Design a protein with these regions (language model features):
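N-terminal Rossmann-like FAD-binding beta1-loop-alpha1 element of flavoenzymes
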Residues: 2-28, 360, 364
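Short, solvent-exposed loop/turn segments at secondary-structure junctions
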Residues: 10-11, 33-35, 47, 99, ...
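Glycine-rich FAD pyrophosphate-binding loop
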Residues: 20-45
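Dinucleotide-binding Rossmann-like beta1-alpha1 core, especially the glycine-rich loop
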Residues: 46-123
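Generic structural signal for residues in well-ordered beta-strands
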Residues: 76, 208-212, 335
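Active-site/ligand-binding neighborhood in enzyme catalytic cores
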Residues: 88-93, 98-226, 230, 237
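Mid-domain catalytic core of redox enzymes
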Residues: 214, 218-328
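C-terminal catalytic lobe of FAD-dependent flavoproteins
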Residues: 308-368
Length: 368
């Protein structure tokens, strides 16, 4: 049985490993020169610092099986993402918490007092929020919205917050305590040696053959009984209906001596600052020690045909086009579409692994 897996990220590698353990051979191809997709990590040859080449990836989940699955691949070090934001010449904790509120407004409020204080500033929620801006004004009020969300959102999405759905902001918590952990999941960490060695272990099996620098060609399908596709959904169909919209990222890399900003992630919400954030990569591995530091300034823009896609836009125009592509995908015999690109969704790594496990198990169950 010929099985082709397109994409050597977590989706493809997990499926290949599950099939291999069940006795099925597969070929994994990837157009890039490396495995692990956008989770790829590599050592900086000049400094020895472990770099998250496509931006920071912190593993966080409440899925105990997925957490155990990841830990079986290699040591996972505890890590808490404590994001900061530089706003109008001051540094604040993100997401907004009691410290942020007290510092920003010059107060010393206790939790209940802070809730009432913010509630007085919020716009009344007479009707459900439709736009990002509506949601922000109902959730945090105009002062915090203008300072922390408006400019950042415009830079990240290239659109007015009035044109974005409220659901985007619903993913961002607001806390009335001093918890500055960006995530709230039970399990959180980063692989000691990065993500790429974990994916390499998944692909290291005699029944798995991996080819890098190998883009998919339609003529490859003839020799396969089944294809697992984790590339762009529209790309599989040759973009025949048009291209689904994505945002991409550009990174401006620079090296300094010592410690540049004292944290892994510093957001820059001010509209006058052209980049969205600065990431300092040695802080993603605090168990290591380095004399120098490597930082990335991160710029967001619309993705072109040759760019690496990061975030699906999924506005009304994309939703209509997505529905058409989903209909094509459903009718495509012998092909399973997986992963964030294959399903045109924003997926955290734990969900990616969970869905890959479930997909492989379902495929194997159907063959019995």
């Amino acid at each position: 049985m010929g099985i082709l897996i397109v994409g050597a990220g977590f989706s493809g590698a997990v499926i290949a490993q599950e099939l291999a353990q069940a006795g099925l051979s597969s070929t994994v191809i990837d157009s890039r020169s490396h495995i692990a997709g956008n989770c790829h990590t590599e050592r900086c040859p000049e400094t020895g610092i472990l770099l998250h080449r496509y931006g920071p990836h912190i593993f966080h989940t409440d899925d105990a099986e997925v957490w155990a699955y990841l830990n079986a691949l290699g040591p996972i070090m505890p890590f808490r993402n404590q994001v900061k934001a530089t706003v109008r010449g001051a540094v604040y904790a993100m997401p907004i918490n009691l410290h942020t509120i007290n510092q920003f407004f010059g107060q010393t409020l206790r939790p209940a007092e802070a809730r009432a204080f913010i509630a007085r500033r919020c716009h009344p929620a007479h009707t459900p929020a439709v736009s990002f801006e509506d949601q922000a004004l109902q959730m945090v009020g105009p002062e915090l919205y203008e300072a922390f969300f408006k400019g950042y959102t415009e830079k990240q999405w290239g659109l007015s917050p009035r044109a974005l759905p409220a659901s985007i902001l619903k993913r961002l918590p607001m806390r009335f305590n001093y918890d500055d952990n960006y995530f709230s999941h039970r399990f959180q960490g980063i692989p000691q040696d990065g993500y790429t060695p974990l994916v390499a272990r998944l692909l290291d099996h005699p029944r798995i053959t991996t080819h890098l620098n190998t883009p998919y060609r339609p003529d490859m399908a003839a020799a396969q009984d089944h294809i697992f596709w984790s590339g762009p959904l529209d790309g599989y169909f040759g973009f025949r209906l048009g291209r689904l919209g994505y945002r991409t990222l550009d990174f401006e890399r620079f090296t300094e001596d010592g410690d540049y900003q004292g944290c892994a992630v510093m957001n820059h919400p001010d509209a006058k600052v052209p980049y969205t954030r600065v990431t300092e990569h040695k802080h993603f591995a605090p168990w290591e020690s380095h004399a120098q530091t490597v930082c990335y300034r991160e710029y967001a823009r619309a993705a072109g045909p040759e760019d690496t896609p990061y975030y699906p836009i999924r506005l009304s125009a994309e939703q209509a086009l997505l529905s058409d592509y989903q209909a094509l995908a459903k009718a495509e015999a012998g092909v399973t579409f997986v992963g964030r690109l294959g399903t045109y969704r924003y997926l955290d790594m734990d969900v990616t692994i969970r869905e890959a496990l479930d997909t492989a198990r379902h495929f194997l169950a159907q063959r019995r």
